[in-house]
């Protein structure tokens, strides 16, 4: 898996294909109707937002943790005083202790590499947005929520 850098490279590749080969990019326009294309691009934007939270950023002893996992652990930690302990034989729920251990155990070089990859995402998304806007104009999908998710991801990794 190539993480945030792979995601950025994929968006950049798709932007280039849209610029250079729009008439042949799947799904094809149906006599000027771009509804399927817009739907496919919306799907890509949704997946990009999801991946921003789901890609692994920390390596624990038995699993990797994503930004979504960190959020979940933080929420559980805040609600821990009201929660019952896990049933015997069931794994303990995700905890801030596990996240803290993973933060200590994840090599700094890995974290810096993840951050470098994530920092490529805003430009890659901007390239795709420009390519789509050039071809579809107002008919194209909105990029704002994906742009916000990408920006939030970069900000969180910079902390």
Question: What is the predicted function of each stretch?
Answer:
Residues 1-5, 13-159:
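Polyanionic, low-complexity intrinsically disordered segments
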